[in-house]
A protein has these predicted regions:
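N-terminal presequence-like segments and the immediate start of the first folded domain
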Residues: 2-127, 132-190
Length: 190
């Protein structure tokens, strides 16, 4: 079970104008990203490695991170599996899986950036693949789980373009897989 529930539905006014989990939004905006994660009650899973014959989960150019697909792996290492739709996982369970994908992406970002998530300048794009029953047509709503996490953690830097598609199966029977394109700031040097 995720340590928090995000009800952030893409409304900047909701985030800026109201307390979030009892925390004043003005205070949240002034915090470093790592402190914000802690304040929001988020526990990141350990960063994962490749699940097949490739050796990087994230490729870094001077200002961009190209992130391989991340699966919904919980803090305890278990994987959210199954297809979403009639006779399978519910929309809400799919969104929870997408949240775990988002948390895994953030864990990889933190690892890749030496712990400095403030180097994230912009989450540019998410691409989500949803394991779906043929009758299920709400893949875009499943991906809200990942988008909500990005926007809660990175605020305006977390707003992104996004694509969502459905497929009949994913590697390891994962429910969702999400990859990301992230713009980063150069590391601080003296």
């Amino acid at each position: 079970m995720l340590a928090m529930s995000i009800s952030y539905r893409g409304s900047r006014a909701l985030y800026r104008g109201t307390p979030y989990l009892g925390v004043d939004s003005q205070r949240l905006q002034q915090l470093h990203t790592a402190a914000k994660i802690k304040l929001l009650g988020i526990t990141l899973p350990p960063p994962g490695g490749p699940k097949a014959n490739y050796n990087i989960v994230c490729w870094e150019s001077p200002t961009t991170l190209y992130m391989s697909g991340h699966l919904p792996i919980r803090v305890d290492g278990s994987l959210v599996t199954g297809s979403i739709g009639p006779g399978g996982l519910t929309l809400e369970q799919g969104q929870e899986a997408a949240r775990w994908c988002g948390l895994n992406l953030i864990a990889t970002l933190q690892d890749q950036l030496g712990g400095d998530l403030d180097r994230v300048e912009k989450v540019v794009k998410l691409f989500g693949i949803v394991s779906s029953k043929q009758e299920f047509k709400q893949q875009h709503l499943v991906l809200n789980g990942c988008s909500d996490v990005m926007m809660a953690v990175f605020e305006d830097r977390g707003y992104h373009a996004r694509s969502a598609i459905g497929t009949n199966t994913l590697p390891l029977d994962a429910a969702v897989e999400v990859e990301a394109l992230v713009k980063i700031k150069a590391p601080f040097t003296r």
